[in-house]
């Protein structure tokens, strides 16, 4: 599939049947047009099932035979996950599926009737119109290790979100029943703290158990970081606690549930991380990516999950656009506004790169030097956040070179931006 717009337009010929689909959770609505935008047939509704997909294919074949169309392009506005099964079916059947940008659909739908209304008949026509104008992108569904990585990275993200919810529930519990607990244990997730919370958690229960027995719990578990001093401090703090005493029995049960949820989700997260590491090892070039100081498995896995096989891209600039890191100028007439990033692309990929750039600047000598150069150079110095974006784009080029060309990471080549400036002067 070609990516230049003129080439996309040329792929829609007089012999092409253009079909736009409005994707839904249970039903899809399709409309067919020729290359000039003239509608062929009526709206076709089909269910999100094999029978529905086969009926849709038969409907398209009927229109192809009736209007003498030799090929077909199906355009959709990707809506959540509802298009995945249809996309896989069309791919298996050898039918070309392309994507139109939801933002473009929103902006274009008012042209026909000067109304921002949305309905199942209107959207397929707008989608098909965008396809005939070449305003679409080719469908890409990762397969093999890249598909597995995308799923596992999404699972990790979900588990982290659920762990955050559990930690917020812990914070609420302590704020109500034992606000002073975190003064004694700076980190309630410490092994000594979690072990104690399984035995006792409310201030009155801690006082009743006593410092000796608390210390014995830690000694039996062979924990050396805590001892009698910490146990005594905890008991004294519990005696003076302002925590709520009403409902203490239910509070203890709530803590039991919290601990069970925490351990279960933590075990799941550890297992997912283990799988992610295994998947990364299946991609030989990932070792070179991990050899860069400051780059970890999370960054490598996140990048590969979002981008897939980089060899499908002609240049790293296309990945930069995919991440929504392309520069956007805000100018009109004599006014020249600030240049910003487009933010039109995969937000997860953008987050992976941005979150990787910050520790790189802090720990990697080459990237740190590059950041200092960007922010202090005499000609067009960047603000710190702008420099982080520039570092993110530089990281894309480094990863692309490693994955597409199989080269090793060269710190001196990375610093060429700095070395080039004196030569130009």
What are these regions (language model features)?
Residues 1-425:
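A detector of single, family-specific signature residues
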